[in-house]
Amino acid sequence: MKKGIICVALSILNIVLLCACGAGRFSAENSLPELVIGGAEYAPYFYTDTDEYTGIDVELATEACRRMGYRPVFVSLDLENRAKALSNGSVDCLWTCLTMDGREDEYTWAGPYLYTRRVYVVPQDSAIQSAEDLAGKKVSVQAGSTSEELMLEGQVEALNKVDTFAVYQSLGEVFMALRRGYVDAMIGHEGALKIYTEQYPGEYRYLAMDLIRSRLGVAFRKGENEELAAQLTQTLQEMTEDGTTAQILEQYGLDVEQNLYGGTE
């Protein structure tokens, strides 16, 4: 009987200790300073899965914050409103597949941590073979994206001859416009567009050229959090060197050479 009582007592003690340890970890995590991170629904970088945020940027941010001693708090933003959310203090930084190129003086940057390509996609049987063939055609892009900025600013000569740019709120709508034949081509981030085109093997084709290659960074308000940005840059570099970033990219099916090191021209 005594042995039974002792076993029960030890079991209860173990449960109490385990609960105490769990509570301690929970308390320690909550005591960490928060880093409020603004993202945008943009698979495979930032999206919702079973009511939780996930994606490449989310995993990179979570690991970087763990190493730096911060607790990440993710907030979903519209692409068009992300700059406003940062400037008014709603978020501490933008970690949302954000292109650094052309914006170097607009923010305090951490990174670059990845590279990206903006590409042209057409139906497999389309006669379009180059950007020049888009003259007089209809092209879909996402509102607030780098692709839309390039179109509005007239930076790419071939795009100046496009007849109509159809601008949609989400990348899913950009793709559906092409699938339903409303437009002749779509332009966007290669990694994000593949989420859609790979659902229909052999039906879509990427033109053998890039619209633009650019660097991705984490944006803080201009002139603020410079030490934090520098620390984050160092942490992201360490994650590249120890293979963490490559492992995350492979998990989401992206080419490591292209996305981590910029590929080749």
Tell me what each language-model feature is.
Residues 62, 66, 71-133, 205-210:
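Acidic, polar ligand-binding/catalytic clefts
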Residues 40-41, 115-122, 190, 194-237, ...:
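Periplasmic-binding protein-like
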Residues 81-84, 96-106, 150-153, 177-213:
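A ligand-binding cleft/hinge motif common to bilobed small-molecule-binding domains
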Residues 1-34, 265:
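Short, low-complexity disordered leader/linker segments with a strong preference
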Residues 18-26, 146-168, 205-206, 237-265:
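Ligand-binding clefts/hinges and TM-proximal coupling segments of bilobed small-molecule sensing domains
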Residues 22, 58-67, 125-128, 132-146, ...:
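Extended ligand-binding regions for polar small-molecule ligands
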